[in-house]
């Protein structure tokens, strides 16, 4: 089990620190997160960790070809899903928290029941290379996937059929995400571009970034759908206004030059940007002020994925090959 003191952050903010939120005016004092629990169960790098939308479950996916379902109340292992013949790069939850979908290097996606008997309900075949990223639309009748074959595919959940294939990028696709009403898809790619697509027509509506380098490693819509968080492999996170296409905020201080590390919006208590990092830490920034509020230490390898609990002030993070653990962090009451 990783050490790292007792998991408290002793970098930017510690137990006695308020970050730089201050105490004057109506700005709340920043309350630090502390290490709550370490989950062990995977035998290789954990590529993705995500809380269910109802907050009752946590799912993790790994290079070890399995996905694990955990209780998000006591963090016990509920079920281990097996079936992929290669490592899993990403997972997604349906809006009702009843189903998950996994994206694998075996060129398939699998839809799983998150309820007993935890069966594989569908295998989605069509990609011709590693499937790297996946997401459900809000009604959860469609799934979007991105692959090293440079295409985006949209799948019908009920039938498992591919209903649209978009030749989206000129290099592997690192991220795909629907907006809040399911009308738009944002995609990111190693070709240095980030694009917005009409989900129904499959047409490109806007290109947010079109640089040859650095690679765009992650992109997702904000909860209100007005902004897009974009990560690039020059250790930079940017917040873009979708309507204008302009970048409003830049977040730096973490290390991200190699892996497609996920980031997230934390909105349960204050508005934060949360990201993993290749220096084995989890970083939290104030969304508006852009300053680092806290660095969570404890993992023993790069932090590849982070997820924020939808209701509780909790964060989950997952580690690369040398770590192989999930750490749960809880904010002081």
UniProtKB/Swiss-Prot annotation:
Disruption phenotype: No visible phenotype.
CDD domains to which the protein is assigned, alphabetical: WD40
Family matches, as SMART domains: WD40 (SM00320)
SUPFAM superfamilies on file: WD40 repeat-like
Pfam family, one: Beta-prop_WDR5
PANTHER family according to UniProt: WD REPEAT-CONTAINING PROTEIN POP1
Protein name: COMPASS-like H3K4 histone methylase component WDR5B
The species this protein was found in: Arabidopsis thaliana
